[in-house]
Each structure stands twice: as C-alpha cells, then as structure tokens.
C-alpha cells in the first residue's frame, strides 16, 4: 500500500487536459533486470540496461527496492560511498531508511518521504536500515532515481532537500480514479516540491481498477512510465504493461496510463487491483556520459579525477 493515500481523491485538484492535444504513442515496453546493490539488497532496474542512456536522458538510473518483508536483523542497506556529478532522489513508499552524509546531514526517510541529494562536486553518504527496522524487521519498498547534471553544474556545491510526505502535491483525474503524488516538476499547472537543477517531471500515480489518467506533458521532455505494481495499459493504443516494466513514449503533448479493469490474481508485487506507476520525463541534456560506479561525469579524465579526489579525501570524510 502506498504511503500517501487519500480517502476521497475528488477533494483534490484535478488535472485537466485540453481537447486539441496530441497523444504520445508508446515506442516500446521494456522489462527490468534484477541486480544486487549495497550490502546485498535486491533491486529491479529498467535503466541503464533495458534502454539506452540516450532514451532515459536526463535520467541515468532507476532502481526499485522491494517490496520486501525483512525479518529481524535481516535488513541491509548501502554503507558509506561517494557520489559526484549528479543527483540521487530516494523515494520511500513503505518502511524507513536512515541516512547520513559527510557534510553533517542525517535523518530518517519515512513513508512517503523523498531525499533529494545533489552530489555535485562530491559527497559521501550512506542509506541504511534504522535501528527499529534492524531490531524488528518490517516491510521495505522504495525507489532511487539518478538525475544527471549538465557539464556546467557537475561541480555545483552539494545540496540536500528533505521532501516530507506532507509536502507532496496531491492531484487527481477528472473522475477521481487516480491519485497523483507530484514530487517534482509541473503537471497541468501544478508544481511539485522538489527544486531541480535539470528540468523534469516526476510523479507517483495509483490508479483504481479500470481507471484512466491522461496528463499534459511538456513536448520538449521525454516521457516514461515505470510500473511499480499491478497491471494496465499505456498510451492511447493501450499497450499492456505490468510490474517491473518500463513504457517509453514517443513525441506528443499528453501521456495516458490505465489500470486493468480486473486483474484476477496478484502480480509479482502482490498487487491484485490497483496500478502503481511512476511517470517521469525531462529535458534531455544531450552531452557525453562517462560512468564508473558512483560517479557520473562527461569524460574518462573526469572519472579518473573523481577517483583520485575520493582517495585523497577531497569528497569528504566519514563522520566519527
């Protein structure tokens, strides 16, 4: 169950779409691949891998963690590690994660919260289970998105934005069948709380069985829909989509997703009814990409410099 819910979505502002719009067709649907990250937790990753970086640009990576039920003393996280050249956006649907960084920041990312960290010139951080989760176990479900920075912002000072659940912009469709949690960017004249260096739109949408959502979409942006759970269709042509799949849209100025009317049985995430989907897109940066581990730069020389700077302690030190 998503962390931020509303008993009656019809009390929320509704996303309206003009009549003379051009629906974006679905250019492809891609399956995620399975990966092991951090200290051994499992993720589903649609990109990089299923689609090329030129397709996901300005995003480089999307990981879905869980949903998983941890037994006591079973949960693991991502110990201290560096980043440079991009932003990490960690969104927690269920459970909680503790985080710390080399600039003295820290706290707990709770259900419905988003941690928006601009690594920029460089920072060290960790994301680990809280003491409560370690002791008692519990459900964990989250998403991490890497947003690239253009070359002139690769060395911008590190920044942290704690976007708590109560600050999300909540919207709905004209019939109230969709709950839209706008994390960043603009949808139909409404803005999310995230302050982005790179122009993007990022939203978490839950659709009731059979419900449809059509949203206006910046024609200069790319557009993708990633299925967190459930089954449904994407685009005006109703391409089937299911859990852990990424739908990539072609040109146009509206995006449509629809939940299956009756699913009949639970999918791999345990979701038998609703369609849970991330809508994301942004203005492509269209610059060369050099990637190595936790660094995302433009050239191999910049990657080598990042490694040298990390080894020299120039990206920060782990607090004692």
Predicted segments, located by residue:
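Jelly-roll (double-stranded beta-helix
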Residues: 1-320
């Amino acid at each position: 169950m998503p962390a931020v819910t509303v008993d009656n979505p019809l009390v929320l502002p509704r996303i309206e779409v003009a009549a003379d719009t051009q629906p974006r067709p679905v250019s492809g649907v891609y399956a995620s691949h399975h990966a092991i990250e951090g200290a051994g937790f499992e993720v589903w990753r649609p990109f990089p891998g299923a689609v090329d970086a030129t397709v996901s640009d300005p995003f480089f990576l999307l990981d879905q963690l869980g949903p998983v039920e941890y037994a006591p003393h079973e949960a693991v996280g991502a110990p201290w590690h560096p980043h440079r050249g991009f932003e990490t956006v960690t969104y927690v649907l269920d459970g909680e994660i503790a985080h710390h960084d080399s600039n003295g920041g820290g706290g707990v990312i709770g259900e419905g919260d988003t941690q928006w960290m601009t690594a920029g010139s460089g920072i060290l951080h960790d994301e680990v289970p809280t003491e409560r989760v370690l002791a008692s176990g519990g459900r964990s479900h989250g998403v991490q998105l890497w947003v690239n920075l253009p070359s002139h912002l690769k060395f911008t000072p590190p920044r942290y934005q704690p976007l708590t659940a109560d600050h999300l912009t909540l919207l709905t469709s004209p019939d109230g069948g969709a709950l839209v949690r706008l994390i960043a960017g603009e949808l139909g004249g409404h803005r999310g709380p995230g302050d982005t260096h790179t122009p993007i739109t990022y939203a978490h949408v839950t659709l009731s069985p059979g419900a449809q959502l059509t949203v206006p979409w910046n024609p200069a942006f790319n557009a993708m829909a990633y299925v967190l759970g459930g089954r449904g269709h994407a685009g005006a042509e109703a391409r089937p989509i299911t859990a852990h799949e990424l739908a990539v849209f072609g040109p146009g100025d509206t995006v449509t997703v629809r939940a299956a009317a009756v699913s009949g049985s639970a999918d791999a995430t345990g979701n038998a009814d609703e369609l849970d989907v991330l809508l994301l897109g942004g203005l492509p940066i269209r610059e060369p990409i050099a990637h190595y581990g936790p660094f995302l730069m433009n050239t191999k020389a910049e990657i080598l410099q990042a490694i040298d700077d990390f080894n020299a302690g120039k990206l920060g030190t782990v607090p004692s």
